Amino acid sequence: MQGLGRAPAVSIAHMAMRWCRRELGINKRKKFEPIWSIVKGYDTDCGAYDADDNEVWIYWDQCEDVRELIQTCIHEWTHQLQPIRTKYYKYPGSYSRNPYEREARRNEDKYTKECWTHIKQNNKWITQ
């Protein structure tokens, strides 16, 4: 996100993650609450979910724009809600056809606009 910069990107990502927690909920099957980290990436991935530690990783600098940043937050948060350790890796098909990936992509489409609208309405500095 060359144009936006680190501080605003990290701030928006934290707001998106809080929105996800409030609106999408948390996985009650986990022994501990989910956490998230917004950090600089080291390859081309925009985000990741670690099911063992129940941690969402957002690589802010790998996202092209605010839309992709928010989509990544929603996508990875969706994985936090899914049975990743027990079912995700048992799917024999390709990554793109995995039903858990498909659900995460559907949630990106479904919730990105709503999340971004909420962030802009509650943070006037964004629209300046």
Could you say what each language-model-derived stretch is?
Residues 92-124:
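Post-HExxH zinc-binding segment in Zn-dependent metallohydrolases
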Residues 1-4:
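Acidic/histidine-rich, surface-exposed loop or edge segments in extracytoplasmic proteins
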Residues 56-73, 94-96:
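Short pre-active-site segment immediately N-terminal to the catalytic Zn-binding motif
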Residues 7-30:
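Zn2+-dependent metallopeptidase catalytic core
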Residues 22-31, 86-87, 115-122:
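Surface-exposed helix-capping loop/turn segments at secondary-structure junctions
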Residues 9-13, 66, 70, 96, ...:
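Hydrophobic (often cysteine-bearing) scaffold residues that line and stabilize catalytic clefts
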Residues 35-57, 64-67:
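Catalytic zinc-binding patch centered on the HExxH motif and its immediate surroundings
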Residues 77-94:
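Catalytic Zn2+-binding segment of zinc metalloproteases
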